[in-house]
């Protein structure tokens, strides 16, 4: 019973909503300022934050066919134009994606490995 009592102490407290300790630890580990780190409730939340910061209703967002389902949802949620590039063998066609970029393109989403197809792109090809 003592172990249970000890384990339950503090369970009624809410976690730090700003992630102060986590941001400090990440900043220390990756040698960046804590203010450069944004935390979110999973990738969906972070992708929406990124879209809202960098794009708007006049923007285009490029992503591959068969890419992560959240990309078109996030694009639609901010009223941006979705530019879906046809996939090749269920994977990203990086050359076609690059050609799809216009002056209105604010984001290019590339999942690697891709979800849901599990195809991947080697790092060297991503650094264009």
Indicate where each model-derived feature is located.
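Short glycine-rich anion-binding loops that position phosphate/pyrophosphate groups of nucleotides
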Residues: 43-44, 68, 112-116
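N-terminal small-domain helix-loop-helix segment of the aminotransferase-like
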Residues: 1-45, 49
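Short acidic capping loops at alpha-helix termini that bridge into adjacent secondary structure
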Residues: 33-37, 57-60, 104
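Glycine/Thr-rich phosphate-binding loops of Rossmann-like dinucleotide-binding domains
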Residues: 47-50, 71-72, 117-118
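Conserved PLP-anchoring active-site segment centered on the Schiff-base-forming lysine
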Residues: 53-74, 85
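A short helix-loop-beta submotif of the ANL/AMP-binding
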Residues: 78-82
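Active-site phosphate-binding strand-loop segment of PLP-dependent enzymes
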Residues: 88-128
